[in-house]
Amino acid sequence: MSDKDVNPVSVDVEGNTPEDANKEILEKYDRESKTRNFDNRKLLAWIVAIVAIAYSIYHLWIQFNPIPALQQRSVHVAVGLALIFLIYPTFSKQNRTKIPFYDWIFFGLSFFTAIYIIMEYTAIVTERGGIPNNMDIAVGILAVLLVLEAARRVTGLILPIVALVFLAYPFFSHMDFLPMRLITREFDLGDIFGQLYLKTEGLYSTAIGASVNYIFLFILFGAFLTKSGLGQFFNDIAMALAGHRQGGPAKVAVVSSGFMGSINGAAVANVVSTGSFTIPLMKKIGYSKNFAGAVEASASVGGQVLPPIMGASAFIMAETTGINYGVIALAALVPAVLYYLAVIMQVHYRAGKRDLRGIPKADLPRVKEVMKERGHLLIPIVVLIGLLFQNMPVGHAAFWTIVTTVVVASFRKTTRMSINDILEALSMGARQSLAVVIACAVVGIIIGVVSLTSFGTVMTSSIQSLGAGSLFLTLFFTMLASMILGMGLPSIPAYIITATMAAPALAEFGVPVLVAHMFVFYFGIFANVTPPVALAAFAGAGVSGGNPMYTGFQALKLSLAGFIIPYLFVFEPSLLMINPEGLATNATEFPLADVGDIVLNVSTAVVGIIALSAALEGYFRTHLNVVLRLLLLAAALFSVVPGLTSDIIGLSVILVIFIINFMTDRKEKAQTA
């Protein structure tokens, strides 16, 4: 989702063809959706479907039939490349119903990059002693070029350009015109492309390892859940529970979009798909176009920090840090709940301020009927959580939850999956994974260069210099780096690049590995709602018909807690519920923080988040004047800052302001009675 150089324009979705309008919005703000269109009766569609289904089956098969990592990952990248050259046009305005001859050549060459490693594997690993021959170098160059071209088609120009900058460094790293700290030894083609192609520290790095073993399977799991109708369940149950309440449709959007965003991890696509249902309802009861689009964007983006599935970067975090994914998911729970509490409370206070009522109960589905019809679709998610907490390997857990989804969906006729549905889910999952596969492969180029040279150490020392010995300043500059990269790059490379540079710098201040990586993880994701480049918000504006930039700033306001929470868990790690000091690498245990600390800090954070939301909206029980808003904002920040003194001051001021506001509300109601 990195086609950042777009000129946001609203699209009217209230015409006769809303599906076409939504597709136009999606293609405008989500580069990944600009694919070729094949008639299902044509041979090309069958070829793509067969390759995609085989690709998914391969990932299921290797969970129980492991092969050497280099071979496993090379096949993962090669088939992903092959599918990209079939599905994505060379240029966006190119004829999308045909595949040009050169893409068939690229298709074949993509397979060749993996076939070569499989055929030459023994010689590469044992006979050559790590020294590549000319053929190794040639195929390595071919693989890198194919990856860069595929990335250009899927994500746009920015990611390949960043990779090329890193790739150029070892060619010039010995030259005197570079700053002294960047000068290192000379590298030849064998050094560079041997590192990138023949080792698991380049194209086939830990990022691709996470992609093949974790991310692909969870994307596939999401495809099966979508096919079973779980999205409809989330919409219906949210409507049944919250639709009739004050500002109901907006609360429905937050809940349903959050859960769906957690499953599919695609913020822009989720805004368009879920927003096409929730945004018209929000507008109908009186929310403005800009606010409606912003609510959908904030909720969809937050799904990537919401357990149990979260965004793809969380799996990269598990692979990079060696920490069990279940531990990471548990640690992410409280911060995610705090974030969604902030969004829901702002929605609630906006509704109170403008007297926006919910939908009549008679027009809403009933909870009992929704649970009876589709409630069983929650079972696979419960199974997944159970398997993760039983320390089952993540890939195996994903496999069994996919099987569980098919079995559970068969419980009712309305959700039962036919053979055709299963094949479509296999194909859909493969296609949806391509953007992640190519992003991880390009990240591998960056990781390979950093591993080969001293570039990572240089960047770490640069961040330390900027921080000037201050943890807060180091965190601040890390946040800026994450957000700037997140505006121009997909979340995976933004996370990897920033974590590579910043995590060691934060470690110098005693920040535990898990906490440092979670900090970086958050800001790379919330760049999607940060103007001037806020693609999720722009997509929300497209669906709502609002002003893209106004919607972007409104989404930023709604998501403000997401920019505060990472600082909170750095200074008070008990908000992660995990004791990071007792967390070893390859940890499979769940060393909980002190329960008293968890309860105290979570409680004060909840009060602070509610107060922050009231201050931002200028409303609690009734309107808040400017002075009370500013005092409440300051008190909210005091209450969430770790420390007993700050908690007492913040909570006391909040209590006084809420009492004043409550009494004002009673007085106003008495006067109008």
Describe the predicted segments one by one.
Residues 222-226, 257-266, 298-304, 388, ...:
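Transmembrane alpha-helix interface/packing and boundary motifs in multi-pass membrane proteins
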Residues 235-303, 309, 313, 322, ...:
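Hydrophobic transmembrane alpha-helices that form the pore/transport pathway of multi-pass ion
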Residues 37, 62-66, 88-99, 123-124, ...:
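Membrane-water interface regions at transmembrane-helix termini and the short interhelical loops
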Residues 149, 154, 164-179, 183, ...:
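Core transmembrane alpha-helical segments of multi-pass membrane transporters/permeases
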Residues 70-81, 128-140, 331-338, 398, ...:
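Structural signature of hydrophobic alpha-helical transmembrane segments
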Residues 5-45, 330-432, 535-637, 665-673:
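Long, contiguous bundles of hydrophobic transmembrane helices that form the permeation core
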Residues 134-138, 201-214, 241-253, 285-291, ...:
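Membrane-interfacial loop-to-helix junctions in multi-pass transporters
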Residues 1-130, 137-141:
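Conserved, well-structured core domains of diverse proteins
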